[in-house]
Amino acid sequence: MSLNKTIYEGKAKAIIETEDLSIVIQHFKDDVTAFNKEKYEIIDGKGIINNHISAFIMEKLEKAEISTHFIKTLNEREQLVKKLKIIPLEVVVRNVAAGSFCKRFNIKEGERLASPIIDFFYKNDDLADPMVSENHILYFDWLSSKEMDEVKTTTLKINEILVHLFSNASIYLVDLKLEFGRLINDSTKIVLADEISPDNCRLWDKNTYKKLDKDVFRLNLGDLKEAYLEVAKRLSVKLG
């Protein structure tokens, strides 16, 4: 199935083409980065954990009628996914104040938000992923007004599902970064892309507020792999 040709390689994943032009393989790497690649390390097995957690969550979302690129897990590091034209936006939904949100508004980390807040960022490493408004998105034609409403509605639905999922595992979903893309064979169809794992969620233990996400690496708080394994264990994700 695989032609072994990598058509895209990012910080944490690689995309490999297959004989079917509408399907690709998503390969999870052990690389971990922070601060726009200023901090970098390889953590053995990190990609395996994220592959399984993301597959578990994508399957949950599909059952909840959220359209995703996920097709199936191939092996410990790879998934078969639909090929997409990625929309150059990071869609961040926040439930609790943390990270850049606190710095931007000078508020204390951990403050609960009355309702989820959605922020958009332009995916561009050279520009350090600047925050953009809905007017910017319309101006650059990344999404139409109707598509933007669709993405926001889907984002809030995903957030609601995952807040409940993680809460049942005694974890707070603090915030979540999503990406979307258009199907190669139907550009009118926008689906959830990328991954959902501790790499792109902020996750805190509900009792101790211990961080169980990439902030462990960013802020030198301990063993990243141990934190990710704890998330997998609490979600009852089987790693092999």
Swiss-Prot record:
Enzyme class label: ligase
The UniProt record lists the keyword ATP-binding: yes
Keyword Ligase (UniProt): yes
InterPro entries the UniProt entry points to: SAICAR_synt/ADE2_N, SAICAR_synt_PurC, SAICAR_synth, SAICAR_synthetase, SAICAR_synthetase_CS
Domain of life: Bacteria
One Pfam family linked to the record: SAICAR_synt
Cellular component annotations (GO), alphabetically ordered: cytosol
EC number: 6.3.2.6
Membership in a protein family: Belongs to the SAICAR synthetase family.
Protein name: Phosphoribosylaminoimidazole-succinocarboxamide synthase
Organism this protein belongs to: Wolbachia pipientis wMel
